[in-house]
Each structure stands twice: as structure tokens, then as C-alpha cells.
Amino acid sequence: MKSHAEVVIIGAGVIGTSIAWHLAKAGCHDVVILERSHICSGSSSKGVGGFRQQFNTEIDVRLSQITLPILLEMAEEIDLHQNGYMYLALNEQEWQQIQARAKRQQAWNVPVELLSTDEVAYRWDFLNTSDVYGAAYCAKDGLSRPALATAAFAKRAQALGVEIVENAEVIAFERNVSDDRIEAVQTSQGRISANKVVIAAGPQSGAVGSLAGIDLPVKPMRRQAFHTGPSQAAASTAPLTIDETTGFHFRPDGDGQLFAMSNNEPLGEENLTVDLEFGARVLGFAKHRLPQLSIEKIATGRAGFYEMTPDAHPVLGAIPGVEGLYCACGFSGHGFMHSGATGILMAELLTSGTTSTLDISPFAITRFAEGKLLGDGAVL
């Protein structure tokens, strides 16, 4: 590991590697990523892997729209398929809400369409639509693999001179008390000084922030996903489909299906055990929605973390009062689908002091103390 870098990034997940690549593309090649384990060893390796433009706030939509072309350029490399995303309304109130939401999204240039129950049944005849009132569907949304995207970002960054140091856990920060500037990072592999440091450590970002002396309200929350064995090939064409009422959702995954659902997990607990009792509950929803697939059991399960903030939106930008310290974390389950935009925006900020692609001031850390929390983060 070198002793100094212009920019040190903490975390080699999909966000950290994207920032590094975009920095190098912008001409800043003196970048080091510090990773406590190995590239993509954390949340980026566990995600369901959907990407969508169907959000409740315009700024989230814009992050997805900026990211999508970047992902499409790497489509084959990251196993990207535009199967779409579909939200199913299971009662009249939800159907009214989905229609209103789709109208807003269309005004933000999201190519979302509203489908009747009959249209859903015709397009995807393996779905049980007996309780469906209608759906919102965007064909440009779809599926990918965040681990492959992380590897692709990392490879491109390294080709432009970025150094990625694995097994380098951050243990302390050095701050100059005279001007309150971050001067260096102490790691399990030694010390590295830097002009700028970016915390992009996913669910561990809050803990890393504490080492730097800041209150960064990012906490891990367990999310689980369950995989079936081989199922009928027709389901491979399915969009990532969400039951609006329960949050149950599924996507094609290899020769089977991947199911997930919120379980009201506590914040801050680093528990990665798989709850098979919860898996059985999820399986019940899967059997109801996909009766033709004759799904009898779960083959495997996995657990990872969302990196949650109080308003389920990220913290992006400089940290006031600590010169040279920046954050790009707290994506609350949306890191992969906003990774490209985050790389662009943070590269702009780090090289020029401002962003030109999109105003990121709504994501400032100061919003929590000022009571300026953002709207519904549309977390699945």
C-alpha cells in the first residue's frame, strides 16, 4: 500500500468502485480503495439485483436514469436483462395509488405503463392474478448481478491506475486539530495520508464515521432472499414482480426463482443468519403468486444488509466541519441501481468542489439535524 493518495475511498463495494472508476476517468488517478475484506465481500454480493426507475421521488428517478446507460454499456458483463419491474395492486386503494404514482413518474420521463388484470394475465400466464386489481410495469427496468457490476467497476478503475488494498480494515483517523482536517487513515495494514477521504463502507459506514468523530446515521438491517430449485422456463421472462400490499417480490434467477420480502428487521443488529421459519412464510406467498411452477421448497437462502438511514435515502457529499471528509453511503437497498450516478456525482464533487449533473444538496448529512428528511424511499 502506498503511503499517500489524493483520494482514499473506504469500501470496495459497488459504490466505492464506481466512485474510483469515475474519478480515474475524470483524470484523478491517484486513488486508493481500502477494503476490510475483499472486493465485493459485503452487501454488494448479496443483493437481489434489480434496477428500476419506478420511485416515489424525482431525485431517485434521476439517479436511476443517470445510472441505466452505464449499466447497459456493461450488459453482457454484468448479466443484465431488461425484463422489467411490475407492481401489483391487490386492492382498490392500492390501484388508485399506483395509477397516481405512475402519472407522476411519466412526467419524470419514466416509460411506465398501467396494465389491467387481464393484460397482466395475458402477458405472464404463469402468474395468479385472481386478487390483482391492476399493475404498473416499466419494461426498461430489469435484473442484473451487483457482484458482477462491482467487479466490472473495479477492473475498469484498476486499469486506470486505481489501487485496491484488500484486508485493510480502517481502525482510526488522524485529524489536524488546528484546522479540523482529515490527514490520514490508519488501517490494519498501516497508515495512508490523503487529501480527501470518502466513506463508502455500506452498512459499516456508521461505525467508520464514529472512528472519524462524526454521527453518521447509517445502520445495517438484515434482508433475506430465498432461491428455489429449477422451475418452468416460462418464468424466466417474468419481470421483478412486487405485491404492493405485502412487499413480497420475486425475480427469475438462473434456473429457478429468487424470493424476498421485508420482515421488519431491527436496525443495527449484524445478524446474517437465515431465518428458515420466515423463509417458509415467504414460500407461501410464492406458491400463491406462482401456482403453475409447483414450487414445493426453498433450495437455498441468504442474508445480507441494507444500509439504512432515517429517511431511506443516501448521505452524499462533504461533511461540514471536517475538511477533506466525504460520504457516499446509506442507500437503503438502492446502491446498485444508483451506483453509476453516484460515481459520476462524487467524481464531480471531489475534482471540482461541486456537482453539475445533479444537485445533491438534498442528500446532505445536515438534513437530519435540520428536519429536512426526504420523502418515501420506496424500499422493498
Model-derived regions: residue spans:
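Beta1/beta-strand and adjacent pyrophosphate-binding region of the FAD-binding site
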Residues: K2-I15, V32
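C-terminal catalytic lobe of FAD-dependent flavoproteins
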Residues: K287-L380
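Flavin (FAD/FMN) cofactor-binding and adjacent substrate-gating region
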Residues: L72-E73, L90-L160, V165-E166, A172-R181, ...
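Glycine-rich FAD pyrophosphate-binding loop
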Residues: A24-S44
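Dinucleotide-binding Rossmann-like beta1-alpha1 core, especially the glycine-rich loop
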Residues: V48-R123, G247-H249, F285-K287
